[in-house]
Amino acid sequence: ASMRGGANFAAFASAKNGLRALAQSMARELGPKNIHVAHVIIDAAVDTEWIKSINPEYDKKIKTDGIVNPSHLAENYLYLYDQPRDAWTFELDLRPWQETW
């Protein structure tokens, strides 16, 4: 939502875009102090009990990698953490391979 608004999501999209702008400002302010700030976009359902309970297509999506495994998200956050300063990522966009965008 921080990168693209959707119909009926005006409030959510504007808030997410504000979060992105905040992350950009923090990255510029804190980068010179050796603090890595990254904006991570997770455009997906994450495999939790709550998602399992509300998603009628859960079984189908989990079998086809349509729902993100929390461990795989954690691997991406470790990737950000371990980056050398000369190649910091500011924005990381995570989504299942079959997500339409």
Task: Label the predicted regions.
Residues 1-18, 23-24, 28-32, 46:
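Catalytic loop of short-chain dehydrogenase/reductase
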Residues 8, 35, 39-54:
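Short beta-loop-alpha junction of Rossmann-like oxidoreductase domains
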Residues 32-35, 39-44, 59-101:
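C-terminal helical subdomain
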Residues 1-5, 53-59:
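A short small-residue
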Residues 14-17, 56-60:
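Short, low-complexity, polar/charged sequence segments that are solvent-exposed and flexible
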